[in-house]
Design a protein with these regions (language model features):
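N-terminal basic/disordered segments at the start of proteins
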Residues: 3-39
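Structural motif
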Residues: 4, 77-78, 149
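N-terminal beta-loop-helix "entrance" segment that forms/cooperates
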Residues: 32-58, 180-187
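Short, polar loop motifs at secondary-structure junctions
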Residues: 34-42, 108-114, 155-158, 174-180
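Hydrophobic, well-structured mid-protein blocks that either form specific transmembrane helices
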Residues: 103-170
C-alpha cells in the first residue's frame, strides 16, 4: 500500500510541490492528493489526484472535524498546508486536526516581502483594519486620497470588506469575476490567472 499525502493547495507553491512529488515517486510508493477550495470556476489541475471543495462529512460538519474525518477515512500519512498566507481558518484547522490525530504536518510558507529603505508601507493587522484605514485616511486628507485608486489582489472572499470604502476607486485582480463585479460601480475588475510576467504586472 502506498503512503498517502494530502496537500491543501491552490497556490503556485502547492502546484510545484505536487508536480515534484509525482515525478519523484511512483504510484506504488506515494499517492499525492491535492485539495482545492473550489473558489475558482476552472482551476488548473495539479499533478496527482485532486479533490475540490470543503471537508464536510455525512452530517454536514465541516471545519476541523470534517478535515479529521477525511484524514482518517483516506488514511492520510502526511498533511501539507500549502495554502495562501491569508487562508487563516484552514491553516488553523489543519494544524489542529493533524496535531490531535498525530499525523505528521508540514506548513509550506513563502518568504515575506522585505521592506527596503525607500519603500513606504502602511502596515495593518488584517483586511478589516486596511478598509478602516482607507475610510479614516480619506476623512483626514480628502484632497489627497479622494477617488484615488486602490489596487486589491486579495482574492474574492475579502472583497466585501472594502465595499464600505465608497470614496475610493478600486482596481481588483481576480481569477474569476466575483458577484461584486456586477454591483460595485467604484471597482474595475481585471481577470487573469498567474503567474504573471513582468509585462503583465
Amino acid at each position: 500500500m502506498p503512503k498517502k499525502l494530502l496537500i491543501l493547495g491552490g497556490t503556485r507553491e502547492a502546484y510545484e510541490l505536487a508536480e515534484c512529488l509525482v515525478s519523484q515517486f511512483s504510484p506504488e510508493q506515494l499517492t499525492v492528493i491535492s485539495s482545492l477550495a473550489g473558489v475558482t470556476e476552472h482551476p488548473r489541475q495539479p499533478a496527482g489526484e485532486v479533490r475540490i471543495g470543503g471537508f464536510s462529512d455525512t452530517t454536514g460538519t465541516g471545519g476541523k472535524s470534517g478535515l479529521q474525518n477525511y484524514l482518517l477515512q483516506e488514511k492520510i500519512s502526511l498533511l501539507v498546508n500549502a495554502t495562501h498566507p491569508y487562508a487563516a481558518q484552514i491553516s488553523e484547522n489543519a494544524l489542529a486536526a493533524a496535531t490531535e490525530l498525530q499525523i505528521p504536518f508540514l506548513r509550506k510558507t513563502r518568504p515575506p516581502w522585505v521592506k527596503l529603505p525607500e519603500d513606504h508601507w502602511i502596515e495593518v493587522p488584517d483586511m478589516e483594519a486596511a478598509a478602516n484605514y482607507l475610510i479614516d485616511y480619506k476623512t483626514i486628507s480628502q484632497n489627497e486620497l479622494y477617488k484615488h485608486s486602490v489596487f486589491l489582489t486579495i482574492g474574492n472572499r475579502g472583497l466585501s470588506i472594502f465595499r464600505k470604502c465608497n470614496k475610493n476607486r478600486f482596481i481588483v485582480r481576480t481569477v474569476d469575476p466575483p458577484k461584486e463585479a456586477y454591483s460595485w460601480s467604484e471597482a474595475i475588475f481585471l481577470e487573469g490567472r498567474g503567474p504573471f510576467t513582468l509585462e503583465n504586472e
